[in-house]
Design a protein with these regions (language model features):
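Catalytic cores of peptidoglycan-degrading enzymes
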Residues: 1-97
């Protein structure tokens, strides 16, 4: 999903985990991917900066990036995705945690 947000505002980890990727990815701009174990991963795209590095352990609510427009969209926003066993799933239940 794409969530409109103020440019430069914090992007926070949805759950505890380990950073798998903090780099540019075509179509997503600057991306942070967090592995939460049990096959669950979260992807945060369109960032202006990453605040974590590959291998870092993160806690739920920890700032991991800052909102930007690196995905090529005109408005600052966050691309947010959850993958379970490699398949995209509805991220909305995760947002209520």
């Amino acid at each position: 999903i794409v969530i409109a947000a103020r440019e430069g505002s914090d992007v926070r980890a949805i759950a505890d985990g380990r950073v798998l990727l903090a780099d540019w990815l075509q179509g997503y701009g600057l991306v942070v991917v967090v592995d939460h174990g049990r096959g669950d991963m979260s992807l945060y795209g369109y960032n202006q900066s990453a605040l974590v590095n590959v291998g870092d352990q993160v806690k739920a609510g920890q700032p991991i990036a800052q909102v930007g427009t690196s995905g090529g969209q005109g408005q600052p926003s966050l691309y947010f995705e959850i993958r379970r066993q490699g398949q995209a799933v509805n991220p909305l239940p995760w947002l209520g945690r």
